[in-house]
Amino acid sequence: KTRVYLHMRDWNNVVTEAKKLEGGRFILETNPATPFVSYKDNQESIFSIPNDSQDNASVNGAMSAMMSAREGGRAMCPTSPTLYNSKFWKGDDKRRNLVLYRASDDYYFCDKYQNPQTREEYAPILRYAEVLLNEAEAAARAGDKTLALEKLNQVRDRSLADPATQTYKASDFANTKALVEAILWERRIEFQGEGRRWEDIHRLAADDLLPSGGIPAKIEYNNVKNQGAFVVGGEVKAEWFGNSKQFIPYTDKRFI
């Protein structure tokens, strides 16, 4: 429900529904990798689609087969330098262990799904981390910056090398827009490779604070290979974006 209400911009109901899950069976695992390496047995996954190596795994388990850069994987979903280089993603963040560098491609790939040969991993649909970040964004937009910061830090801090010194403080954000921007970047980092990005692009197309404006331009693989493009906190160069993958405005007929 929090996901639906967030798309509807019904901030109060997002918070109300999120509160219903507090203190219940679902929690935020202490290690950000746990929902993926322990996909059958963790307390963070609210809803996942099970896969089995003996049950049509070639189709049902296509997620790991297509995304993984490990042996047997097709590595078709690389991590963009736009995300990898983001100032919001610290270099010692534990979630950087969930991206894998493959030298033959000179590229990083999402490594949440690590069994491309057996393809038995569960497909994550909804995790408690999303509930918390949905609540954080809704609270920020509704004017409750204290609650927003609490929920944002709850998700982010578990991945920090030193939460005591690296956690966000209220003084880090000059206004609501800055806080919401941090929450949106946290979503990109936390849900990389889980299919949440498109929904955010769509719902934020005409946003009052941080409009996506449409489908962002994409970086062309051949434009960054052997260019040293992946640098924590590094720049993202305009020439990396290819003509074949240009920005598509929200008004374009292809934007449904």
Regions found by a protein language model. Give the residues of each.
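Short, cationic low-complexity segments
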Residues: 67-83
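Acidic/polar-rich alpha-helix caps and helix-coil junctions
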Residues: 1-63, 87-256
